[in-house]
Amino acid sequence: MAKELKGIAASDGIAIAKAYLLVEPDLSYEKTEVTDVESEVKRFESALEVSRTELSTIREKAAKDLGEDKAQIFDAHLLVLNDPELTGPIEESIKNAKTNAETALQETTDMFIGMFESMDNEYMRERAADIKDVRKRVLSHLLGVTIPNPALIDEEVVVVAADLTPSDTAQLNRKFVKGFVTDIGGRTSHSAIMARSLEIPAVVGTKEVTASVAKNDIVIIDGLEGNVIIHPTEEQIAHYEKIKSDFALQQAEWEKLKNEKTVSKDGVHVELAANIGTPNDLEGVISNGGEAVGLYRTEFLYMGRDNFPTEEEQFEAYKAVVSGMDGKSVVVRTLDIGGDKTLPYLELPEEMNPFLGFRAIRLCFANEELFRTQLRALLRASVYGNLKIMFPMIATVNEFRQARDILLDEKAKLKAAGTEVSDSIELGIMIEIPAAAVLADQFAKEVDFFSIGTNDLIQYTMAADRMNERVSYLYQPYNPSILRLVKMVIDASHKEGKWTGMCGEMAGDQTAVPLLLGLGLDEFSMSASSILKSRSLIKRLDQSEMVKLAEEALNKSTAEEVVELVEKYTAE
């Protein structure tokens, strides 16, 4: 008998295949006393070394298949494995308590996990998740237990799991894994974001799929509407095969728009750009008809290594992207380290809330030579195309002036040395701190453009960590307060003859696109896989009608009212 579950549509598409259950292995053990503590310590160190080798291999595969930005999660896992503040106490526990390595590992990591999970900020809670993932891997090697390896799947399946860890997702082979469904998670969870990168259908947050599915059960995953059907009838299979076929035809239609400009029904042009992390991501931008790079996250050039990239290394990477876009705009964000992004070779202070602390431009000002090195590389690359530079985490006008003055100083030095530098580089800022949005009219007199980073802007405005399930209901992209801030920024830029882009998740959200078009957004920067779908939508919209929609939305009281309004407008 067919059973239907409802979850959250995380990645578009339809998948119909038998289930592959990614279940947790039995890692139970007995606490024992050891007599040869040195041998036990060596057994623990051996398990650490095997785990390091495995994670390094997984990281390389993730970088190749998903891009460097997605692979950097494994740098955090490798940091855990190499952290003497964690491994040291485990070895001391073995020696002092004469306990087996499994017990020492479990008890020591439990202490760290409990400490991190009790903290209020997202960064620290993510460290707890990293420790859990690493502990499972090390424990499996101590016990000689095989962890299910999704990379070994060699037939067409849909993966069913309580949740997917970064390690799991990075090993999914798109040739065989046609989709996945999980018990937990939301649209902005790690597994959902990875599914969109892999371009495979996914439904998350079903709550009970693992309790409802057995190995080899036929499962339908509807990543368009968030439906999951177990033991579907022939009629249901036929119905979803038709939807799958129609969606494939729809994608083929979108593909025809690849070389077209993004113009609304009434002739208003906006730019659809892509977010990238490395030069390797350019292929996806070009194949999906990206009109620009709206966000080049340069921090990924600094990750997965043991030291800072040299000026020459950075120059080559920036040159590759700028020249590769063949004259199209490339907006480069300067180094955004701190918060949830760390470097193993850069010591950062311990902070109660690193997301509100020493990060991004603040860190660059305190490490000025590091900042200057990056700016020199960018300035040298500017002659190879249409480079724009923006500074992250700007809160005050003085911060922008300080960053600009450092850049102009480096530009003058390069020119004095005979190095060619473009004189038409636009300078902008990320709008992710509410203070910058409120003061946009003053910023607009000095910057060339704004790029709204909605992920942080929403969190800071609503005082709600989107990864904290207890307050995630407050992470509301459609809250009128957020829309008013966006409108304020766009209007301020236009008043001064400047432009505004958006590079957060909201820019590629199909519910948000009509609103943003009506609010006057000039550039939408999103994952490359969302570009053609968004272009198709905008071509069907009348911008003058969307202006009316946006005006109505700004006067609503709740996010729910705004969503209802958009659905009503787009259905007509």
Swiss-Prot record:
Cofactor(s) the protein needs: Mg(2+)
Main location: cytoplasm
Binding site for phosphoenolpyruvate: R297, R333, N455, D456, R466
GO cellular component, one term: cytoplasm
InterPro entries: PEP-util_enz_mobile_dom, PEP-utilizing_PTS_enzyme, PEP_util_AS, PEP_util_C, PEP_util_CS, Phosphohistidine_dom_sf, PTS_EI, PTS_EI-like
GO molecular function: kinase activity; metal ion binding; phosphoenolpyruvate-protein phosphotransferase activity
The reaction(s) this protein catalyses: L-histidyl-[protein] + phosphoenolpyruvate = N(pros)-phospho-L-histidyl-[protein] + pyruvate
EC number(s) from the headed UniProt entry: 2.7.3.9
Keywords: Cytoplasm, Kinase, Magnesium, Metal-binding, Phosphotransferase system, Sugar transport, Transferase, Transport
Active-site residues from the entry: H190, C503
Subcellular location per the Swiss-Prot or TrEMBL entry: Cytoplasm
Subunit and interaction comment: Homodimer.
Record remark: domains: The N-terminal domain contains the HPr binding site, the central domain the pyrophosphate/phosphate carrier histidine, and the C-terminal domain the pyruvate binding site.
Cited function: General (non sugar-specific) component of the phosphoenolpyruvate-dependent sugar phosphotransferase system (sugar PTS). This major carbohydrate active-transport system catalyzes the phosphorylation of incoming sugar substrates concomitantly with their translocation across the cell membrane. Enzyme I transfers the phosphoryl group from phosphoenolpyruvate (PEP) to the phosphoryl carrier protein (HPr).
Protein family according to the UniProt entry: Belongs to the PEP-utilizing enzyme family.
Other observations noted: The reaction takes place in three steps, mediated by a phosphocarrier histidine residue located on the surface of the central domain. The two first partial reactions are catalyzed at an active site located on the N-terminal domain, and the third partial reaction is catalyzed at an active site located on the C-terminal domain. For catalytic turnover, the central domain swivels from the concave surface of the N-terminal domain to that of the C-terminal domain.
Name of the protein described by the UniProt record: Phosphoenolpyruvate-protein phosphotransferase
Originating species: Listeria innocua serovar 6a (strain ATCC BAA-680 / CLIP 11262)
